[in-house]
Amino acid sequence: MERHCYLEVAGARLLGVIHEADDAATRLPLALVYLHGWAGYRIGPHQMFTKMARRAETQGFTSLRFDFRGRGDSEGATAETTLTTMIEDALAATEYVLAKTGATQVALIGDCSGSEVAIGAGPQHPQIAAQVLWSAPIVAGDRARTDLAKRKSVLSAYGQKLLRRDTWSKLVRGNLQTDQILKVIRGGGKGAGEQGDASDRAIDWFARFSGFRGPRLFIYGGNDPTTAGCLAHYAELCDEAGQRFDLHVVEGANHAFYSLAWEDEVIDTSLTWLRAQALSEAPGHATR
């Protein structure tokens, strides 16, 4: 059973979709809240959030997918969206799903920038019990290495396109969006505003990361140019914070897991891990 819902945050109305098992007796106490990436919306990359929420429903999970302010069908100015506002929205979504369903705890499922949001929101609510982070960028550390790897990957991709006949045909016909291409190259693959707002830079990211005491699962694509740097960073960060480093690497996969086999592996791995957390009697975390 899935239905649309609306939640209010800072005077803006956010659109969401709730998924619940028809039989209330089969519902697990752990609800899933999905946090899309910077340029995404509630369906996730190539509808992975929608697919996972529907699959999760058959396993007893309640899910909430929603659009952040300024994204998708939610109200709010696109240019005013920051990681800080996205964290506020994630906390409001957590409150909403707890109030409107029988769930008693929440797991945050973040994709790319949504993983940063999950990390930022984690210790801010006592009923956030677990996190699943897909292709999480580096927080609480130097991103220069992974940003450079991403920029090189973007340049390589456009370099390969230059060798294609259809690219030159588009250029001759005036159908090539050169302004957009230059914008992407200059930004190193980052969208407008993704470099970070002053309010985002003011967040103590290590405190947010280490302050969350629940389990985390990191999932990366083996062929994502940022993976090596991220794995080294988060292994060290987890060790420094005294936390377990649960990791799954999808061999051959890119940043967004663009194949049916890769996305199935991500979804199945996430749900298997989440079900183990839902059936565990261990508390989620201890600090705000």
Regions found by a protein language model. Give the residues of each.
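Serine-hydrolase catalytic core
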Residues: 6-9, 52, 151, 155-282
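N-terminal cap/lid segment of alpha/beta-hydrolase-fold proteins
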Residues: 1-30, 259
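Short, surface-exposed "cap/lid" segments of acyl-processing enzymes
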Residues: 22-67
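Primarily recognizes the serine-hydrolase "nucleophile elbow" in alpha/beta-hydrolase
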Residues: 92-160, 209
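Catalytic nucleophile-loop/oxyanion-hole region of alpha/beta-hydrolase
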Residues: 71-105
